[in-house]
Structure formats: structure tokens, C-alpha cells
Amino acid sequence: CSSDLIKERENSHNLQSSDAFNYWSQLHSDLAAKFDKEIEIDISDLLPQVSWGTSPEMTIAFNADIPKTSNSKKALNYMGLENEKNLLNIEFDKVFIGSCTNSRIEDLRAAAAAIKGRQKAASIKEVLIVPGSRSVQKQAELEGLDIIFKDAGFSWRDPGCSMCLGMNEDKLAPYERCASTRSEE
């Protein structure tokens, strides 16, 4: 239930006591509602996904081979990849941790815990850390997460548009590869 998800979030007490939350809580399906179809999908065996192409449907499990399809030649050429190449053998130039929707404080805490005491690999040109909002940035700095990232050789950025949109200096050069995070819920 969405309201349960909200209750798990920090500072949700402000939202839960709001008029908006009270109104939203009244919006639900009728108990006798009938739907055309209800489906349940078990994704417990789904592996992390990566994109090998230029469109969302060009996505496979991180350890899979790039499929050989008739419509992939143009995308593969653009990406500098080949059919049936395993993505585990692809080297990255940059890493991007962030985005306005996927750089919550809990995401940054998890990233900091994973890299604390480690260094950016010499083969990686740059690692960008972009907090999802100013409040996330402030909280991360209060907790010292920015120091962990900087000590690892990462770039700590201000929140805002970054590599997702590529409208500033946070862009990839042709044929550069970037590992970026997503934590869709």
C-alpha cells in the first residue's frame, strides 16, 4: 500500500498529518470493485538490469550476452558494441550515482557504506555523486557522507540536473561508457 511506503520515510509525520494526506487516504477502490484483470508478477529471480542500446527495451540482465536482433545494428554501432558480447566484459569510463528521483538519503548512505575506505579505480575517469535535493545534500553533509565520497576520489555535486539530461558539463563523450544507478520502487 502506498501509505505504508510513505510511513516508512523520514519526516513522513509532517505529510501524514497534512490535509492532503487525509484527503488521499480517502481515495481507494470500492470494496466490491471489479477489475478487468489483476496480475501478480514474481520478480524475485530478476537480476539487475543494464541497457546495451539506445532505447529502454534494449535492456538485459547484467550478466547476459547482447542479443542478436535484426533491429539492433544501428544501436550497437552507436554504442560501439557487438552482438552476442557479454556485458560483464565491458569497461566503464565514468560512474554516476544520483538523479532527482534516485538519490535519496538512504541511497547515498548505502553507497557511502559500500565505498568507505576505498578508492575510485584508476581506470575510471570520474565518479559523480549528485544528491536528489538540497535537503538530501544537507543531510548527507551532516552525516559526513560527502567526506566519504570525496576521500574515495569522487566528485560531490550540488543537486540538480546532471548526467540524466546532459545539459551541462556532466556528459559523456562519444563511446564513453557510464554505469549509473537506479533504485526504482
Regions from the language model: what does each represent?
Residues 43, 158, 180-181:
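Pocket-edge structural micro-motifs
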Residues 120-171, 177:
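Extended C-terminal subregions enriched in glycine
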Residues 10-12, 171-174:
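Short low-complexity, flexible loop/linker segments enriched in glycine and/or proline
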Residues 5, 9, 111-114, 118, ...:
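Generic, well-ordered alpha-helical scaffold segments in large soluble proteins
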Residues 47, 59, 151-153, 174-184:
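Cytosolic catalytic domains that perform sulfur/thiol-centered chemistry
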Residues 14-132, 140:
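A glycine- and small/hydrophobic-rich beta-loop-beta segment
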